[in-house]
Amino acid sequence: MKSKDFLAAFGAFLCIFIMATVSDLDANNIWIIPPFGASLVLAMALPSSPLARPKNIVLGHLIAASAGVIAYQILGNNPLSIGIALGLAIYLMLITDTTHPPAGANPILAVLGGESFDFILMPVA
C-alpha cells in the first residue's frame, strides 16, 4: 500500500468520524448524510479531479439540495418531483461549473424526506 493511499483513507475516516461524532452529540440536528461519504471518496482519493474541487463539493451540494427542497415544496413527494429535482440539480450544476456527482443524491433525499429549506443549511451547508 502506498502512503498516499493510506493518507486518503485515513483522511476520509477522520472527516466522517468527526461529522458523525458531532451529529451524535447534537441530537437536535443532523450533521451527516450519505452523500458526504461519496464526496470524501472524491476529495481524498481523487483530489486532482475537477469534480473534487472545494467549489464543486460545497456549491454542488447546496445547489442540488436547493433543487430538491424547491421541487418538494412546489410538487410534494411523487415520482415527477423526484425527476424534476434531479434534472434541475444536474442542469444548475452544469451551468455553474459546480458538478459534483455525490450531490446528485441530495435532491432525492430532500423530496423523499419532505425536507424544508432548513435542509439546505443543516446538514448540507
Question: Where do the model's predicted regions map?
Answer:
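Alpha-helical transmembrane segments and their membrane-interface boundaries
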Residues: 1-70, 74-83, 116-123
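Hydrophobic transmembrane alpha-helices of multi-pass, membrane-embedded glycosylation machinery
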Residues: 39-40, 87, 106-110
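Active-site beta-strand/loop microenvironment that shapes enzyme catalytic pockets
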Residues: 66-67, 94-95, 106-108
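C-terminal binding/interaction regions
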Residues: 104-125
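Membrane-helix interface "capping/anchor" motifs
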Residues: 48-56, 93-103
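Internal alpha-helical transmembrane segments of multi-pass membrane proteins
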Residues: 76-100
